[in-house]
């Protein structure tokens, strides 16, 4: 609760996935934490941490035989188990706009919507779209229009979070209270442009190069590469080579990005803390 920027994301996810297992804060409350015992935690682990949902991922300068030996030492004695439950796919929710008085120094705002799951073919065009809007680079469209050109917001970002059966996109910004409405107008203008005008060939090529460069740099971090490889194998049963990723990104067309922008951002929900 000391960080409104974190708290608003938790609350937005609760609302966008309302009525489902995803629609509640997993941190719990004082009363729910007080009810937990060592036995209840053990039962939870046994029910959810099944071997059919596990992957052992290792990246580094270590022989495969050594990795296998370590894995067998710590996991070899465990019996194979299978998950016996499945999550119900969250139902769609009506778009909402809610303002909550938090007496914060700044206004914090999220504009978002439900999006594609992790298996969807359009997840890559959407990833490119989100990177265009509010990726980590200083030339992202929202950073340029909100911060560099107009000096309205110091912190803005866009994220795409895919799950096994659904997903979510969110655009976040913080600003002085009197600038919040102007920020929302500028964001809406950028979204309308991306929904109605395809990117030029030159602009799209630059965006793809930047996206691929970001991926290549991230792979230099062994921990991040290890986690990404493990997740890919667990979800897709394969790990794409860097060349395969390059091929898939290069195949994305400007029209696909525009269509995704229209499909995802035609109806959005908004949560404001102020």
Language-model features, listed with the residues they occupy:
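Phosphate/diphosphate-binding glycine-rich loops and adjacent basic-rich segments that engage nucleotide
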Residues: 94-105, 109-113, 121
């Amino acid at each position: 609760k000391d960080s409104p920027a974190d708290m608003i994301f938790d609350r937005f996810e609760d609302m966008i996935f309302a009525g489902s297992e995803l629609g509640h804060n997993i941190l719990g409350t004082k009363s729910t934490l007080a009810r937990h015992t060592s036995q209840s935690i053990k039962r939870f682990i046994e029910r959810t941490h099944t071997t059919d949902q596990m992957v052992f991922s290792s990246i580094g300068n270590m022989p495969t035989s050594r990795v296998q030996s370590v894995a067998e030492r710590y996991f070899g004695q465990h019996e194979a188990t299978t998950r016996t439950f499945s999550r119900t796919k969250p139902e769609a929710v009506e778009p909402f706009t809610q303002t909550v008085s938090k007496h914060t120094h700044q206004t914090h705002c999220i504009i978002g919507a439900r999006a594609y799951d992790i298996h969807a073919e359009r997840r890559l065009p959407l990833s490119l779209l989100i990177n265009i809007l509010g990726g980590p680079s200083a030339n992202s469209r929202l950073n340029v229009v909100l911060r560099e050109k107009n000096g309205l917001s110091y912190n803005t970002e866009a994220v795409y979070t895919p799950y096994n059966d659904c997903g979510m996109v969110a655009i976040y910004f913080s600003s002085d209270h009197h600038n919040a409405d102007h920020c929302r107008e500028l964001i809406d203008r950028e979204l309308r442009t991306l929904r109605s005008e395809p990117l030029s060939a030159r602009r799209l090529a630059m965006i793809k190069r930047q996206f691929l460069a970001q991926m290549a740099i991230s792979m230099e971090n062994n921990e991040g590469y290890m986690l990404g490889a493990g997740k890919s194998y667990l979800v897709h049963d394969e790990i794409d080579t860097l060349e395969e990723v390059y091929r898939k990104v290069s195949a994305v067309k400007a029209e696909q990005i525009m269509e995704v922008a229209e499909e995802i951002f035609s109806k959005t929900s908004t949560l404001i803390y102020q």
